[in-house]
Regions:
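Bacterial Sec-dependent N-terminal signal peptides
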Residues: 1-28
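Acidic, contiguous N-terminal accessory segments
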Residues: 18-143
């Protein structure tokens, strides 16, 4: 009796695993965010877009990495500032309390790219996601 129950147990275990739903990453973002919703519109990057940082000095350093990267890969020189101006498309790093250390929220509209986090780790991961969402043309050396 024991010899028959062991194989039946393993078959049952395998069948339980077969019922799990596969998660498909439609956006080619790694790691796949917990939630993601596609919106209409595009944000157009140019040298007039300021980078606004409302966070610690360490986050300012992370934001300056964005400036350096965009200058290197796209020839765009974005200027850091502490002030957000209305009706000026901007990239904003905004610190809020209460999020997990590596958590972030990335929001992109035609007027604003905003990375919100509580810790530098979250800002770093949000920026890595933003890099993955940039069009491939940005990474071309020909301009």
């Amino acid at each position: 009796m024991k010899k028959k129950s062991l194989p039946v147990f393993f078959v049952g275990l395998l069948m339980c695993g077969c019922q799990m739903k596969e998660v498909i990453n439609e956006y080619n973002v790694v790691p796949l965010p917990v939630t993601m919703s596609e919106q209409q519109g595009r944000f157009y990057l140019n040298s007039d877009v300021p980078i606004v940082v409302n966070a610690s000095q360490e986050v300012k350093h992370i934001a300056s990495g964005l400036s350096t990267t965009l200058l290197d890969i796209a020839g765009l020189k974005l200027k850091p500032t502490d002030e957000l101006h209305e009706n000026v498309p901007s990239i904003v790093f905004d610190s809020i309390p209460g999020m997990e250390k590596e958590a972030y929220k990335l929001s992109v509209t035609p007027q604003l790219i905003k990375i919100t986090a509580s810790a530098p780790n979250g800002f770093y991961y949000g920026l890595q996601t933003l890099y993955q969402l940039l069009p491939v043309d940005v990474y071309c050396k020909e301009r």
